Amino acid sequence: MADTTTAAQADQKPTRAFGAGRPQRGAGGAPQRGGPRPQRGGQGETKSWTPVTKLGRLVALGLVENIHEIYLFSLPIKEYQIIDKFLNLKDEVMKIVPVQKQTRAGQRTRFKAFVVVGDHNGHVGLGVKCAKEVATAISGAIVAAKLSVIPVRRGYWGNKLGAPHTVPTKVTGKCGSVAVRLVPAPRGTGIVAARVPKKLLQYAGVDDVYTSSRGKTRTMGNFVMATFFAITKTFAYLTPDLWREVKLIKTPYQEHSAKLSEKQQ
């Protein structure tokens, strides 16, 4: 009798509550695997940075504490991690256009991405990248935009009261047939511009400005690049307030030459 009871218990399958043991589903209905996705542009990467340039080594060692030390001596930035260390940038894709090339096998289609980065406080960059896939083009354009980040010089329309809010003087940028002109505006005017240059000026931290454009502005790539070239010219000249004599100082390479030689050994 005992053997019969044991055999019956062995034949019975274990029961479980409905839904028990299944992976929990998120709001979208798919099982949640791992943590949140990393953001675009390398914001979620946890890889350690190993600098390969002299400037990168100085930044990693903490010997260069401010990005304006780099701009002061016009040192070339060839690693985007240097920009990430000093600035908290936001990026936005302006446009993605397909481009084609005629080959023997037929037409080869690739995607061209225009990306703007900036911190809304005097730093802006523009990157252009062409790749076979959209995601590759966007990530490459973000890196190119970070490497092209420039300081934006801001000024006043009238009396020098409060914080700088507009461009210091009239500046013009040109790309292809498109020419964009930036004109200082009174405080409170806002950015009087089309959608493309307005977005770039917002990322640059300019609050009030008049703009005028001419040429084939429908070509958005030339339109945004002409605006970027105009912003670049804000630091292309010296106004009388910058004529004062400045004591010459050593570049970071000269000042920390001993540390660089130790690192190379």
UniProtKB/Swiss-Prot annotation:
Descriptive protein name: Small ribosomal subunit protein uS5
Keyword Transferase among UniProt keywords: no
GO molecular function: RNA binding; structural constituent of ribosome
Domain S5 DRBM: 89-152
Pfam family, one: Ribosomal_S5
Source superkingdom: Eukaryota
Residue span of region Disordered: 1-49
Listed Low complexity bias regions: 1-25
GO CC term, one of those recorded: extracellular matrix
GO BP: translation
Similarity field: Belongs to the universal ribosomal protein uS5 family.
Keywords: Acetylation, Ribonucleoprotein, Ribosomal protein
Entry-annotated residues carrying N-acetylalanine: 2
Stretches that traverse the bilayer: none
Lineage, top ranks: Eukaryota, Amoebozoa, Evosea, Eumycetozoa, Dictyostelia
Function text: Component of the ribosome, a large ribonucleoprotein complex responsible for the synthesis of proteins in the cell. The small ribosomal subunit (SSU) binds messenger RNAs (mRNAs) and translates the encoded message by selecting cognate aminoacyl-transfer RNA (tRNA) molecules. The large subunit (LSU) contains the ribosomal catalytic site termed the peptidyl transferase center (PTC), which catalyzes the formation of peptide bonds, thereby polymerizing the amino acids delivered by tRNAs into a polypeptide chain.
